[in-house]
Amino acid sequence: MVREEEKGIPVRVVRCRPLVPKETSEGCQMCLSFVPGEPQVIVGSDKAFTYDYVFDPSVEQEEVFNTAVAPLIRGIFKGYNATVLAYGQTGSGKTYSMGGTYTASQEHDPSMGVIPRVIKLLFKEKEQRQDWEFVLKVSYLEIYNEDILDLLCSSRERSSQISIREDPKEGIKIVGLTERNVASARDTVSCLEQGNNCRTVASTAMNSQSSRSHAIFTICIDQKKKNDKNSSFHSKLHLVDLAGSERQKKTKAEGDRLKEGININRGLLCLGNVISALGEENKKGGFVPYRDSKLTRLLQDSLGGNSHTLMIACVSPADSNLEETLNTLRYADRARKIKNKPIVNVDPQAAELNHLKQQVQQLQVLLLQAHGGTLPVSINSMAPSENLQSLMEKNQSLMEENEKLSRGLSEAAGQTAQMLERIIVTEQENEKMNAKLEQLQQHAVCKLDLQKLLETVEDEELKENVEVIRNLQQVLAQFQSESAAAAEAATEMANAEQDAAGEAETGQVTKRSSDDFTTQHALRQAQMSKELVELNKALALKEALAKKMIQNDSQLEPIQSQYQTNIKDLELEVSNLQKEKEELILALSMAKKDVNQAKLSERRRKRLQELEGQINELKKKLNEQAKLLKLKESTERTVSKLNQEIREMKNQRVQLMRQMKEDAEKFRQWKQQKDKEVIQLKERDRKRQYELLKLERDFQKQASVLRRKTEEAAAANKRLKDALQKQREAADKRKESQNRGMEGVAARVKSWLANEVEVLVSTEEARRHLADLLEDRKILAQELLQLKEKKESGENPPSKLRRRTYSITDLQASEMDLSLSKQIESLETEMELRSAQIADLQQKLLDADNGDRVKQRWDNIATILEAKCALKYLLGELVSSKVQESKLESSLQQSKTNCSDIQKMLIEERNHATEMEAEFQNQLLLQEQQHQQEVLYLLSQFQQKEAPGKGVEDSLSEQEKQMQERLKFQEKELEKMREICEKNQELLQENDVLKQKMLLVQVASGQKLRRDQQVSPESPDSPFDYIPPKPKTRRQTVAKPRAPTPEMNVEELFSDSEESGEEEDAEWVPVKAAKGTKKSATGCFCKGRCGNRQCGCRKQKVGCTAGCSCDSTKCRNRDPGFQDATVCEDQTKDSEGSFKLEDLRDVTAGETFFQPVYSPPTMKVLKDITDQGVFMKKPSTAASLLVRDEESQENQLPFVKKKKRMLSSNTSFFSGCTPIKEEID
């Protein structure tokens, strides 16, 4: 383990799976071989790869785990990170090796993969370490289409929140990923099952359960020692199941599957680039493209980082996957060069504490060594020294001084704010002055000619006023000129800055914006100040009014008290007077009764009047006092209202002042920021000025150097002119030598490039042939499997084996009736031959695809001259190939156009032939119906002839009538037959023309000609059959023939009826027609020796004549005497125009087509008629005949020929007819 840690080389394992049933059924062979006892695998015959471990197909899962994976798991408890990585093409067994489809029900299954075995081993090791505390967390994610998906999250909504972060201490971290605490193996397996159920899986042509994403199952382990909390470790275990690399040609992926495959291959390509960058020894410390893919980003620690890594390269042994297997082995071989640097992962705080403790111990040891091995007692009880006290005092004084300075700074800030307010006020006054100045300028527009006015004005006072106005105008003009000069100076300064710094526009915009902001601030301040002044005035007025009213109230208080006293006295006096009045009224009323008291009552009356007057006066005074009191109350209300308004105005003034201060503070901050910017701009301007000076100095230096160089150039120009001639001569000589050398180099480079191109083209052709051979072997394997199944089930062998083939023996075997065993043996032999060819081609491709040759291909080009020659040659070859390709494309297009035209013509001819065939068949049916009616009529006449009960006296007369009728009828029929013969001759000629056209069309379309020979019914699918490909349709059948019927063309159908002859078969069974492609109207048309009964002349018991189509040198049926007699007899019959009717009773069974009357001779005829009716119920259309192969025609024509023979064999009988339906009924 120590050596492994020092080297830091990840372990590489190659595991080979056995052939799957699909590969076995396709006939695939093993392309890998393993060296017993050595970790070596051999591809083909001589290409060997060596790894740390190699497992052949017979090795079980347990051995793989114990040998390669278990050591990594034990290192996890020591604080090391570990990664187990499965890589390979799709369908090579990665998920099987990793256990990606494991469930709890497979606990004791020997095929259990790496992940469940790791879980078991982890918890087993955990139970053995009782002095440690463990915390285990698991997470499960997949990378699907470059998106990270959390497989332990119930909803996929959190997947968008997952991100990858890099911690300098902990390495790669995944933020937002679900981590679950697990305490037992059962909990961990349940998390694994949940993730496996959520993983993306789909079916492809290579694998029914193909993983469509990269899956990473991570187990985090935190362990702490129980008796030492500072001793802790943190480690991670990544179990990675990569999706397999795939080719769209083999997987047949489309749509989403194709997109998934593209993303999978992209991620694996990035992984390969990372492995290549890490494995190149000459580029140590170079850039590693971890960030090109999320897969490589997550595996950054596992590849070249802090981790022990195990890569399991899964390969397929089938020779059909040889190229992918070779790429996988090379991939794993590159990964062997990666060197990781694993370290023990400890808690950083605990590590820091341990480091500090070690440092303290070291310092204590040093102190002990300095004091002679003992620590002095004064170290623990030593008080703070005087130096420390002085420092503390100094620190205290500095803090006090800092506080003073802070207070002074705050006061200075306040004063600054006041100064800013004064500046604002001053600016406002300045703005007012400017406004007045503008007004004066407006008034000064209409300037008067003061000099003329002075001359015309005589009044002294007016002259003085005009003089004052003129002085004011002079002052105004001077002020304007000064302002203009100041503006010009500012403009010049701005222009100078623009020339120096190149930022005049920006400065002007900034200055303009600053001036606008300042003006707006000043206007706001002025407006608020004006509002404040008005508010203060109104407040002062209201305060004065309130004060005045309060003073009046204070003065009214003694008067009010006096008035109240007077009111009370007056009220008392009024009440007394009222009482007195009442008494006087009572006394007066009493006095009226007493006459003696008249004078007294008079006095009392007067007194009463006086009292009433006093009472009225007192009431008036009371009313006035009441009015004064009401006035005081209203005054108090007014005072309270004024006080309320004063308070509101004070609040408003406070708010306004606060707003002014805030605005002033904002302006101060803005001003401070602008001052900083101005300082920065000035600093930048100084730098630019310095750079400008530096550039000027450099320019002067360059100018001086340029002058010196110009002088030197002028001096050297003369020398150059003298040397030009020599240079031209040398250049001409060098050019001649280069041309001579270029010819040899061009020839060498051309031959080398031609050889390389030929090798590459041969390699590609070999690959193409290899693919064809693999496909051919697959088809052969399928056919072999079908034959074996049929042999087991006892079925008959197929009539033809449809397959691709490269040998002529296959064509011959397709037409032969082989037994199943022979066919199986031949297929096995062919498969062995194909396998040998495949192995040979694959070995040659392995030799041709040598990686060193590809790298050293361009080493032969070492100079620019050779490169130019190579480019010139390649460019010429490219142009010539493009021109040739263009010619071939135009030729192909023309051929396609011609082919389409010929196909159209062929379709038209077929349509015409179909129409003609339908028409001929209709005519044939009509003729046959007529013939059957005649036969029935003759039979009925024959039965009547034999029937008893007829009188002798009536027989002669009736017989004469019948003979006359027969003669008439025969003459009519002869006329009809002559017409039919003429039509047949015309149709035969037309048929010959159509055949010639059909032949021309087939030759023009490049199709093979159909052989006009009888095809065996056991092999109707001959490879020389009709060539134009058509979809196979359901064959239209007619009534079953009892014997194989030969094919018949149109000439045979409409040939002369006399060629068929008589048949000796009692049941009218038609015999086979002789083979031939062309038949004449008379005589036989045999191709052979005319030795059997298939010869038409031999059937009629006549010899062959010169009109026959048979070969006279081979014919055995040529008898001149017999032949001439037959011909003369035929001519005699034709010249008479009628036939001699024989007595039906004298006809023997051997010389007629009918049996005697007592036998039922019409059953065969009726059956044939019924079959013909069934045949006519299915008429063939032009469209169906276009897609029908020649097999249907071969099946129909013999039946038609049979009917034609039946028609031609009865031309000597003519009679009335009876409907067929009656006879059938």
Swiss-Prot record:
Expressed in proliferating cells; neuroepithelium of embryos. Its main location: nucleus. GO terms for molecular function: ATP binding; DNA binding; iron-sulfur cluster binding; metal ion binding; microtubule binding; microtubule motor activity. InterPro entries: Kinesin-like_fam, Kinesin_motor_CS, Kinesin_motor_dom, Kinesin_motor_dom_sf, P-loop_NTPase, Tesmin/TSO1-like_CXC. Its cofactor is [2Fe-2S] cluster; [4Fe-4S] cluster. Residues 352-1003 form a coiled coil. GO terms for biological process: microtubule-based movement; mitotic spindle organization; spindle elongation. One of its GO terms (cellular component) is nucleus. Keywords: ATP-binding, Chromosome, Coiled coil, Cytoplasm, Cytoskeleton, DNA-binding, Iron, Iron-sulfur, Metal-binding, Microtubule, Motor protein, Nucleotide-binding, Nucleus. Residues 498-520, 717-744, 1006-1047 are annotated as: Disordered. Residues 1004-1225 are annotated as: Globular. ATP binds at residues 88-95. It is found in: Nucleus; Chromosome; Cytoplasm, Cytoskeleton. Residues 719-738 have a biased composition (Basic and acidic residues). It comes from the Eukaryota. The keyword Heme does not apply. Residues 507-520 have a biased composition (Polar residues). Residues 9-338 form the Kinesin motor domain. Binds 1 [4Fe-4S] cluster. In the presence of oxygen, the [4Fe-4S] cluster may be converted to [2Fe-2S]. Gene3D superfamilies: Kinesin motor domain (3.40.850.10). Transmembrane segments: none annotated. It holds the Pfam family Kinesin. PROSITE patterns: KINESIN_MOTOR_1, KINESIN_MOTOR_2. Iron-sulfur (Fe-S) cluster binding motor protein that has a role in chromosome segregation during mitosis. Required for mitotic chromosomal positioning and bipolar spindle stabilization. Belongs to the TRAFAC class myosin-kinesin ATPase superfamily. Kinesin family. Chromokinesin subfamily. This is Chromosome-associated kinesin KIF4. It comes from Gallus gallus (Chicken).
